[in-house]
């Protein structure tokens, strides 16, 4: 089974020409897992994504991406901050697992993603990629079902205001901001 492994330091991201990065392992009673922070000091060009009529700039000079890799969970959250420190979106990857390799946190991506905008709007992304992966035998039916169950659970938590990872975006960013190198 070939899933795409995504690393927290995003070392292969060509768009980012000057960067700072920090990571740490947290175990504070509330959260257990790695957190990473990438500061895109200089980029070749800004990157915007479209959601219907909306265009959201997710990376530009001075942006920060906080990624949370909670232990024993089937998701990882990337909070994207603009240069003023405002959250532009939360990007929730559904994943097989989170891990660490050569001291860099990673997650094995399971195709389907949830985007949460500061307005509260929830967008499901890449359902077609998930269907395709099932048809091609990249994932099996139990894994396919795990993804949809995870999405349903997370959307329920978000709607109730009890998905804690998004509440901790600012505090987790604060922990790493002064460690950026």
Placement of each model-derived feature along the sequence:
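A short, hydrophobic/aromatic-rich structural module that often spans a beta strand
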Residues: 90, 142-144, 175-181
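Charge-rich, low-complexity N-terminal segments
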Residues: 1-64
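The feature represents the first ordered module of a protein
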Residues: 52-101
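Conserved, surface-exposed functional patches that form binding/active-site neighborhoods
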Residues: 84-137
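Cysteine/selenocysteine-centered motifs that mediate thiol-based redox chemistry or coordinate metal-sulfur cofactors
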Residues: 150-181
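Short, surface-exposed, low-complexity cationic segments
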Residues: 129-153
């Amino acid at each position: 089974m070939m899933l795409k492994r995504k690393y927290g330091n995003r070392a292969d991201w060509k768009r980012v020409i000057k960067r700072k990065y920090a990571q740490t392992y947290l175990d504070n009673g509330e959260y257990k897992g790695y957190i990473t922070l990438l500061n895109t000091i200089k980029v070749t060009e800004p990157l915007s994504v479209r959601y219907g009529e909306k265009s959201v700039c997710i990376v530009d000079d001075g942006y920060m991406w906080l990624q949370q890799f909670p232990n024993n969970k089937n998701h990882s959250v990337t909070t994207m901050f603009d240069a003023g420190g405002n959250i532009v979106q939360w990007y929730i990857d559904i994943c097989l697992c989170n891990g660490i390799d050569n001291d860099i946190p990673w997650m094995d991506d399971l195709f389907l993603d949830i985007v949460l905008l500061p307005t509260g709007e929830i967008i499901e992304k890449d359902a077609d990629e998930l269907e395709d992966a099932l048809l091609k035998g990249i994932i099996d039916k139990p894994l396919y079902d795990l993804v949809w169950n995870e999405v349903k659970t997370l959307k329920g938590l978000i709607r109730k205001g009890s998905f804690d990872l998004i509440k901790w975006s600012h505090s987790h960013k604060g922990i790493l901001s002064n460690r950026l190198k």
